[in-house]
Amino acid sequence: MSVRHFLSFMDYSPEELIGLIRRGSELKDLRNRGVLYEPLKSRVLGMVFEKASTRTRLSFEAGMIQLGGQAIFLSPRDTQLGRGEPIGDSARVMSRMLDGVMIRTFAHATLTEFAAHSKVPVINGLSDDLHPCQLLADMQTFHEHRGSIQGKTVAWIGDGNNMCNSYIEAALKFDFQLRVACPEGYEPKAEFVALAGDRLRVVRDPREAVAGAHLVSTDVWASMGQEDEAAARIALFRPYQVNAALLDGAADDVLFMHCLPAHRGEEISEELLDDPRSVAWDQAENRLHAQKALLELLIEHAHYA
């Protein structure tokens, strides 16, 4: 059986993705009831971080421990990846010592190159193009609060970044309509727009995007690596702040999500995370449970003599 990776939602069928978020909720219930479940005993996940993170490291490391395994944190200072060793060579060596590798990186090509030479599953913990693990958590959170997202309308407000690209893939797999409100020149990548077809509508007015929407989501205006553009972006994106008044134009049962960390007073108003329509804290927690479902699926379970 060939090894499976998780680099993009497009690698999986809708049924598989729905199964993952349902399994995430089941594992969450086991955890909340104090049930010990350790199918990955003695398994080791390598976590390669070229980009810093709080939620990604915590959720994967805690997830592996809760499933009975272990996780090893590797920064660019800890590996030859940061000092010029060919990515394929690193993949060949690491996959002989580990049972899975999670990579949080800049260039998406780093992931595809690593996966092409790895004998163990490779998971996209984030790239400049996509953030599929976050979308698993988002879809699980919506399902827990509102049921199926099929046929619903989702609004993305702000930069057409990696999160926006992943929402496009989610729209195709989970069968919902996506509206993106962004300034001209900050649309999602053309390849994702083309992929979306009639599932996507790009508009300039955030009020148009949220009208009747069942889910509204946003992200920071300047992502990691864009610090030099931050001041200009803040000025340009100011009309795209998500606040209570904007949410009032959405569906009565709208949910608000933010992948965090949030810049209160910028992409969201100061109080929005505390609004009863916000499920950002559940969304953050579900990174743990959704990724445990993913680890359980991808990494070979322990065998007992």
Curated annotation (Swiss-Prot):
It holds the Pfam family OTCace_N. Keywords: Amino-acid biosynthesis, Arginine biosynthesis, Cytoplasm, Transferase. GO terms for cellular component: cytoplasm. Its main location: cytoplasm. The keyword Nucleotidyltransferase does not apply. The keyword Aminoacyl-tRNA synthetase does not apply. Its EC number is 2.1.3.3. It catalyses: carbamoyl phosphate + L-ornithine = L-citrulline + phosphate + H(+). One of its GO terms (biological process) is L-arginine biosynthetic process. Optimum pH is between 8.5 and 9. It comes from the Bacteria. Reversibly catalyzes the transfer of the carbamoyl group from carbamoyl phosphate (CP) to the N(epsilon) atom of ornithine (ORN) to produce L-citrulline, which is a substrate for argininosuccinate synthetase (ArgG) involved in the final step in arginine biosynthesis. NCBIfam families: orni_carb_tr, PRK00779.1. Homotrimer. Belongs to the aspartate/ornithine carbamoyltransferase superfamily. OTCase family. This is Ornithine carbamoyltransferase, anabolic. The lineage of its organism: Bacteria, Pseudomonadati, Pseudomonadota, Gammaproteobacteria, Pseudomonadales.
